[in-house]
Regions:
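Conserved glycine-rich acetyl-CoA-binding loop
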Residues: 235
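Nucleotide/pyrophosphate-binding catalytic subdomain
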Residues: 1-232
Length: 235
């Protein structure tokens, strides 16, 4: 029996470190010899750069980027375009056969807007694993951007951590969050080896975990509860 697939969520900061990105793809190539791998990625820094270049500004609320519908063409271009194809190119350089996707492809995830004040910011839930099963069955590496759409066809910006969680739930996969930090830090700046629900609530309440890390740990907790297995956060 084949082991469960592994979903690796890659932060946008990795795209600014070509050496680290190449090393990661080399390791993914090795990992594919033993199990299926699926990559889900963000691209926050790239979005910021493209928006700044076009004179656009945005704010974040609880780690989520407020996204007017008018900004979606730029965000789609950054995530589903530049970031996705850059990762696919790096995968090819490592001898991997990638397939660039978004959350709407194959109806893999169902997405809906979270709240009107956040604009085109959505949340994803598992829907159909058919496309991903076909791809990993043929040894392709799905590289999935965090762009989704609602049932009525509205493009949505999905937080990449939450998107990766939904993909892991869909595939019954293990989940690994990679970012530019070593892991979750305590109030003394020391990395926590483990983190349970009670510890997380305490660190959030005391303001140790905030913003983007709160979104990441919330997604990891949800995934751990749904998958009934640990979720890993690291660099």
């Amino acid at each position: 029996m084949m082991p469960h697939p592994v979903v690796i969520k890659i932060g946008g900061a990795l795209l600014d470190d070509e050496k680290a990105a190449r090393q990661l793809m080399t390791r993914i190539k090795t990992l594919q010899q033993h199990r299926a791998v699926i990559v889900v990625h963000g691209g926050g820094p790239m979005v910021e750069t493209m928006m700044t270049g076009m004179g656009l500004t945005s704010e974040k609320v609880d780690g989520l980027r407020v996204t007017p519908d008018a900004h979606m063409p730029v965000i789609c271009g950054a995530l589903a375009g530049s970031a996705n194809k850059q990762l696919c190119a790096l995968a090819i350089g490592a001898g991997i056969t990638p397939t660039g996707l978004s959350l709407m492809d194959g109806n893999m995830l169902t997405c809906q807007a979270i709240a009107s004040e956040l604009g085109a910011v959505g949340q994803a839930t598992p829907n159909s694993s058919v496309l991903l099963e076909l791809l990993i069955g043929e040894q392709f590496l799905p590289v999935i951007s965090s762009i989704g759409c609602s049932k009525n066809g509205r493009l949505l910006n999905i937080n990449a951590d939450q998107a990766a969680t939904a993909v892991a739930q869909l595939m019954g996969a293990e989940l690994l969050f990679l970012s530019n930090v070593e892991g979750v830090l305590d109030e003394h700046g020391q990395r926590l080896a483990t983190l349970d629900k009670a510890q997380l609530a305490s660190l959030v309440q005391t303001g140790v975990i905030t913003d983007g890390m709160k979104v990441k740990t919330d997604a990891a907790l949800q995934a751990a509860l749904q998958l009934k297995r640990p979720v890993f956060i690291g660099s």
